[in-house]
A protein has these predicted regions:
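Periplasmic/lumenal scaffold domains of single-pass inner-membrane subunits
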Residues: 2-77
Length: 77
């Protein structure tokens, strides 16, 4: 889907800049749902703020602490 690729191409560089890895990516109903692994919960919150500033609608879901970081669910439209 062209819209999914467009979203990924715009979100990808921000993920790389924040050193955040996408463990899982699902595109459905015009939304990109991703399970992201970051160095900290704060990094996921910063990512959400950056993407909101770029005009995306972003929802940060459940964040779970892990060894060496955090995993969070993010929905982007």
């Amino acid at each position: 889907d062209a819209q999914a690729l467009s979203l990924l191409s715009r979100v990808g560089p921000v993920l790389m800049q924040q050193q955040i890895v996408a463990n899982q990516v699902v595109y459905e109903a015009n939304s990109l749902n991703m399970q992201l692994k970051a160095n900290s919960a704060e990094a996921l919150q910063t990512l959400t703020q950056q993407l909101n500033q770029q005009g995306f609608q972003v929802e940060l879901g459940n964040i779970q602490p892990t060894t060496g970081g955090a995993i969070g669910m993010v929905k982007i439209q």
